[in-house]
């Protein structure tokens, strides 16, 4: 599927250790005829690995599983366990050039504020669930005020919201399909 997506023009692939598909993603990136620097790969550290003694091994497993020289974006998947220690590990690999950008996923303002206290590098992105019926305005505003890019996961509500009257009306207004 990833190879087909890349062939169709996709240039960003989002994966995670938890999804158990990093090897397939890496193979698609290596096997396609697109220069590596034109493909953006995001992966994430699962919260169970965000404990002292596991963080480095988790990232190294991701990098090895992908079979890539670097990851374009690496995120802390959830604000659970040792966030500060895990962030320090991400900063270390960022400084070594093994991660090009570091960020977080599912962090609310209170989590971002806690991280801000000890972080040397601010998160580049906060990947959060946003869809028409889950706006997360407080988190979006906080991120905008702190130059953190908001990236949506589940922006279509996993497809379940496409038949909602409000969505259908907007689509009809602009002569589009929901």
Segments from the language model and where they lie:
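Residues at alpha-helix caps and immediate loop-helix transition turns in enzyme cores, especially N-
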Residues: 1, 21-24, 54-55, 86, ...
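N-terminal binding-site loop/beta-alpha segment at the start of enzyme catalytic domains
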Residues: 1-39, 69
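Short, acidic/polar
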Residues: 1-6, 50-67, 85, 110-114, ...
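Short acidic/polar active-site loop segments enriched in Thr and Asp
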Residues: 11, 69-72, 100, 124
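Short, well-ordered amphipathic alpha-helices
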Residues: 25-30, 59-63, 90-91, 112
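A short, structured active-site edge motif that brings together acidic residues
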Residues: 36-49, 70-79, 106
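CE4/NodB-like, metal-dependent polysaccharide N-deacetylase domain
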Residues: 55-76, 92-96, 148
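Beta/alpha (TIM)-barrel catalytic core signal, keyed to glycine-rich beta->alpha loops juxtaposed to Asp/Glu
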Residues: 78-178
């Amino acid at each position: 599927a990833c190879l087909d997506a890349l062939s169709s023009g996709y240039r960003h692939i989002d994966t995670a250790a938890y999804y158990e598909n990093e090897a397939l993603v890496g193979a698609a990136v290596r096997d396609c005829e697109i220069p590596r620097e034109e493909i953006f790969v995001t992966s994430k550290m699962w919260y169970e690995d965000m404990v002292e003694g596991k963080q480095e091994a988790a990232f190294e497993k991701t990098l090895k599983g992908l079979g890539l020289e670097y990851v374009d974006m690496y995120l802390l998947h959830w604000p659970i366990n040792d966030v500060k220690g895990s962030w320090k590990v991400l900063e270390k690999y960022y400084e070594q050039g093994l991660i090009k950008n570091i960020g977080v996923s599912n962090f609310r303002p209170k989590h971002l504020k806690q991280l801000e206290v000890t972080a040397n590098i601010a998160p580049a992105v906060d990947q959060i669930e946003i869809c028409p019926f889950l706006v997360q305005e407080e988190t979006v505003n906080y991120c905008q005020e702190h130059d953190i890019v908001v990236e949506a996961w589940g922006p279509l509500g996993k497809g379940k919201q496409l038949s909602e009257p409000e969505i259908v009306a907007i689509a009809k207004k602009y002569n589009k399909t929901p």
